[in-house]
């Protein structure tokens, strides 16, 4: 028996729910990745959003009302969860709490990707939430705790200098803000253990690079031992992740070999300590996120970016990743049914969809997952 549910509420789709249908036979749209706002005071060099995607000057950004209409359409298609990915840090959007409250009123769980600086600083929490009467970070975190939310906190390193490199602000007191945010979220119980229930707190060690790859196992262990989900993976192949991918190619041999060792070490430890069962690993294989839930959102949802484009997922941003040009111009049900992700929803015997973007671009189709799978099984025999 595992010690906890190896997932975070609102992200991984369970075997019982994946490939499920509506009463009319349509495969359910169970989850959405979505951009909500573009403001961000950080300058992460690996950001999966290109700089031009954070520029609203074109005037075609989705409004709050348009976003709510999309959610209402998705609810009719079976929507249960939303992940707010960007385009900026969602907690820098003054309408953020209204959006989360709207989702909660529809019984939709919201996963919030954030670097934590707003939740770690009273002045920043007040700055973006004055209209709600919130004056400090604790009140903001309490409000989120009382709503249907999970917090996915950016966490690339235990080391201050390394972490500051990942947010691009060497003179900013970000590291201490992040530490304060993590402490606060733990104090409020986002990671409290509940029988047969996933946690509501995650550490997102993404991307990992050669500069922090030697810390990833320790971050994973630190999180799991506190009932905190941990998701680590290489760079996306989107936005400024393209330049990261180019750098990885220059370091190909070292990065590839260290990644194999990292994934293997995490899985062996997770299996030996009851966080992943041997049976599940043998059946499901290696996840994009080592030791974490299988990545399968591409068979249950879509990604809607700030200007209305509908994408396959956040991992790619090329023309072949665009499902539809503007979600405002066509019913969401039609977009969903016509999408390649809907075809994946019909692959009823498949659970693990790994990550085509990273496997192809970063690992050059070198059977990365199968190599890790074999090494893990050899180590745990």
Q: Which residues are covered by each model-predicted region?
A:
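N-terminal pre-core extensions flanking Radical SAM catalytic domains
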Residues: 1-56, 282-289, 299-301, 309-314, ...
């Amino acid at each position: 028996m595992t010690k906890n549910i190896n997932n975070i509420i609102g992200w991984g789709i369970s075997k019982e729910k994946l490939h499920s249908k509506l009463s009319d036979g349509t495969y359910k749209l169970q989850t959405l990745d979505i951009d909500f706002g573009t403001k961000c005071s950080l300058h992460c060099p690996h950001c999966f959003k290109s700089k031009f995607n954070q520029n609203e000057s074109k005037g075609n950004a989705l409004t709050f009302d348009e976003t709510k209409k999309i959610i209402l359409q998705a609810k009719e298609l079976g929507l249960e969860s939303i992940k707010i990915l960007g385009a900026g840090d969602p907690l820098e959007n003054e309408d953020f709490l209204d959006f989360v409250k709207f989702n909660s009123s529809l019984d939709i769980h919201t996963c919030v990707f954030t670097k934590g600086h707003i939740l770690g600083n009273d002045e920043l929490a007040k700055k973006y939430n004055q209209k709600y009467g919130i004056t400090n970070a604790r009140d903001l975190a309490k409000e989120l705790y009382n709503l249907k939310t999970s917090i996915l906190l950016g966490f690339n390193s235990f080391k201050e200098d390394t972490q500051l490199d990942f947010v691009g602000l060497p003179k900013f007191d970000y590291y201490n803000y992040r530490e304060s945010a993590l402490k606060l979220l733990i104090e409020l119980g986002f990671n409290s253990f509940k029988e047969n229930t996933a946690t509501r707190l995650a550490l997102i060690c993404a991307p990992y690079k050669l500069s922090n790859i030697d810390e990833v196992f320790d971050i994973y262990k630190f999180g799991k031992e506190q009932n905190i989900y941990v998701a680590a993976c290489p760079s996306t192949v989107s936005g400024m992740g393209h330049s990261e991918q180019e750098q990885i190619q220059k370091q190909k041999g070292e990065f590839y070999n260290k990644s194999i060792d990292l994934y293997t070490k995490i899985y062996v430890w997770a299996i030996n300590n009851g966080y992943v069962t041997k049976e599940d690993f043998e059946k499901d294989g290696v996840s994009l996120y080592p030791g974490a839930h299988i990545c399968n959102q591409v068979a249950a949802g879509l990604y809607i970016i700030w200007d209305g484009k509908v994408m396959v997922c956040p991992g790619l941003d090329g023309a072949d990743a665009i499902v539809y040009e503007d979600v405002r111009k066509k019913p969401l049900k039609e977009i969903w049914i016509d999408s390649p992700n809907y075809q994946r929803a019909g692959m009823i015997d498949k659970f693990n969809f790994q990550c085509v973007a990273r496997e192809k671009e970063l690992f050059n189709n070198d059977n990365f997952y199968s190599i890790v799978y074999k090494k893990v099984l050899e180590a745990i025999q």
